[in-house]
């Protein structure tokens, strides 16, 4: 008896696999009923099923397009499209060049009408220093300091300040003013002396011309809102207690 165990010994006698294996087995070939390599029997052997598309299929004949590639096939690719980049800016002019010089206008515009008319309102005069002549041609020559004239004053030229409208008072001597004294008052008396004469007013105050009326009872003026007379006692207050007789 052989020590090697055969798969044909484990199958039943009438198994078609055993019959075909026994009858069609050739030296150096595996049985036809079993594949040459099985990943279950030999995990390290590569699978006999080809991966990917069959050799006869092309990407154009696949109904769903070519198979996606990359780490994330479902994400569309990003970035510029394949191919050479387009030139920027585009070559050539963006707008056609002008056809030539523009023609002269057929209707000429209005030309200058001449000197401008005299304004209705004179121009305001510029401020000038006090005493300067109104006519600039009458101004004298200016010295190195600007407004100060280097020569004598010409007749008609004003000074730095205008002439006052009211003449100044003369600086002559004035008489001493008299001391202030009220009319009818006594002359001043040196300190510490008593003036002669009686003290007090010159005459007593006059007596009143009439006597004041004696205070007394005066008649009450008529009151249109008098309370009608009633029983003795104070009238009852509104809302107060009432006496029943």
From Swiss-Prot:
Positions where N-acetylserine occurs in the chain: 2
Region called Disordered, residue ranges: 1-245
Domain of life of the source: Eukaryota
Ranges annotated as biased composition (Polar residues): 17-26
A Pfam family recorded for this sequence: MISS
Keyword rRNA-binding: no
Biased composition (Pro residues): 74-127, 164-190, 198-207
Keywords: Acetylation, Phosphoprotein
Low complexity biased stretches: 34-51
Modification Phosphoserine occurs at: 2, 6, 15
Protein's UniProt keywords contain Ligase: no
PANTHER family: MAPK-INTERACTING AND SPINDLE-STABILIZING PROTEIN-LIKE
Similarity comment: family membership: Belongs to the MISS family.
Protein's recorded name: MAPK-interacting and spindle-stabilizing protein-like
Organism whose genome encodes this protein: Homo sapiens (Human)
Gene this protein is translated from: MAPK1IP1L
